[in-house]
Amino acid sequence: MNLTKVWNTTLGSLQVQLPRHEYNTWVRGANLLDIDNGVAIIRAPNAFIKEGLESRYLTTLREQLGSVVGFPVDVRIVLATSESERIDGASINGRHAARDTRKSDHHAPLSGGYGNGISHPLERASVHQLELHRAVRSSMLNPRYTFDRFIIGPSNRLANAACMAVAEHPAQAYNPLFLYGGVGLGKTHLLHAIGNFVLDRDPEVNVLYVSSETFTNDLINSIRRQQTEEFRIRYRNIDILLIDDIQFIAGKEQTQEEFFHTFNTLHSAGKQIIISSDRSPKAILTLEERLRSRFEWGLIVDVQMPDLETRTAILRAKAEQSPVPVPQPVIDFLAQRIQSHIRELEGCLNRVTAYAQMYNIPVTIEVATAALSELLDTNRRKRVTPEAILREVAAFYSVDLRSLQGRGRSRNIVTPRHVAMYLLREETDSSLMEIGQLLGGRDHTTVMYGCDKIAEEINTDARLRQEVAAIRERLMNSAV
């Protein structure tokens, strides 16, 4: 039985099931030691956590572990007894520290003395130090960020394929692999997915995920404390380096100097390097040319904004974890209206479900509109004009614009006209009377009827819902 996989799966379920503050306070620091004769041994990092798990979460742990392993288990909580156990127990994914060390070339200069060419051999480092560093490394990977949980679409298909290739064949496919794109598009998810994939296949591989800010802070602290050898142990005795937001080292000379030598050491030793940034290497101003050229040695892939189908798939996957049911019409509505990055998509869905829970009401399009009123008002004002709506509706349904605005009531014109009424009410500040004037001088009660009819039917008519979504997408893409 793979205890690492069992515990990671259990933690993933608990992270979805429990409120975030409860998960972080009580569960995150625990670690599965063994399952023997139907008893799961879970290690708590301190007595406070041990007591909390025993008094609050034994039943939940039994249920979740039993569900994962496929048979009933009892749970026993034990206390970590040493510093190394406490650090290991604090790891998010509960992976055990690797037992062997891998040697590589460690020749870069460091300050204190920085830049003096003096090398501090890693061979003098104690096994205990290496074990502690490995335990801390594993804590930096989020077990929920896996390839299985990554929603693939045209905007990120190449990036996903490149990351999978690197995970399956480290230092053979693309080295370095450089991912770039705007915030909230899944770059960090892919970095974690690589690390989790590699460690699931071989827990002995030394994987380190850090942000460039952490790298810089570690460097500064090591120089101040005269612990540059510790810094080398952390960053150069690894097999895979995953470094996030590399753009933040721009303009920091010492950090760039040290990362240059770290890069060279790892690359020359055949170790895999994966880097993310919010822009391409050429667009990172004040980045040293020697670093820029090294970033371009391997493969550079951009991650783009998700399209409508990908946004819908992301929201659908997120909705499956929601504490309240989220109907498909609401998912479609959010995917149409929130056309930014993935974090905002997920944040909006969380806000809608929280709003519904707070008022103890089901999730509907009306509830979503109320919960996101400020955001939707801001996003909507991409200056969609009434004239643009009428043109898009007429073009979509292949009807004459004059007929759409006229008094005729033929069957092929009634539905497009009602859709136009609905979109004019939803996407502009036009009053019902103004909408009526645009559509053949109709009164406000007729407009209200048409709007309400479409609002009701899109909840049950999938075809109509798709038609309205397509028109909205065209409007948003053409808005200035």
Curated annotation (Swiss-Prot):
Residues noted as binding ATP in the record, renumbered to the chain: G184, G186, K187, T188
Disordered: region residues: 91-115
GO cellular component assignments: cytoplasm; plasma membrane
Domain of life: Bacteria
Cross-referenced InterPro entries: AAA+_ATPase, Chromosome_initiator_DnaA, Chromosome_initiator_DnaA-like, Chromosome_initiator_DnaA_CS, DnaA_C, DnaA_dom, DnaA_N_dom, DnaA_N_sf
Keyword Nucleotide-binding included in the entry's annotation: yes
Domain II: region residues: 71-139
Primary location recorded for the protein, binned into one broad class: cytoplasm
PROSITE patterns registered for this protein in UniProt: DNAA
One protein family per Pfam: Bac_DnaA
SMART domains tied to this protein: AAA, Bac_DnaA_C
Record key words, sorted: ATP-binding, Cytoplasm, DNA replication, DNA-binding, Lipid-binding, Nucleotide-binding
CDD domains reported in the protein's UniProt record: AAA (cd00009), Bac_DnaA_C (cd06571)
Region of interest (Domain III, AAA+ region), residue spans: 140-356
Entry's localization field: Cytoplasm
Assembly and binders: Oligomerizes as a right-handed, spiral filament on DNA at oriC.
Family: Belongs to the DnaA family.
Written domain comment of the UniProt record: Domain I is involved in oligomerization and binding regulators, domain II is flexibile and of varying length in different bacteria, domain III forms the AAA+ region, while domain IV binds dsDNA.
HAMAP family, alphabetized: DnaA_bact
PANTHER family from the UniProt entry: CHROMOSOMAL REPLICATION INITIATOR PROTEIN DNAA (PTHR30050:SF2)
Function field: Plays an essential role in the initiation and regulation of chromosomal replication. ATP-DnaA binds to the origin of replication (oriC) to initiate formation of the DNA replication initiation complex once per cell cycle. Binds the DnaA box (a 9 base pair repeat at the origin) and separates the double-stranded (ds)DNA. Forms a right-handed helical filament on oriC DNA; dsDNA binds to the exterior of the filament while single-stranded (ss)DNA is stabiized in the filament's interior.
Protein name: Chromosomal replication initiator protein DnaA
Upper taxonomic lineage: Bacteria, Bacillati, Chloroflexota, Chloroflexia, Chloroflexales
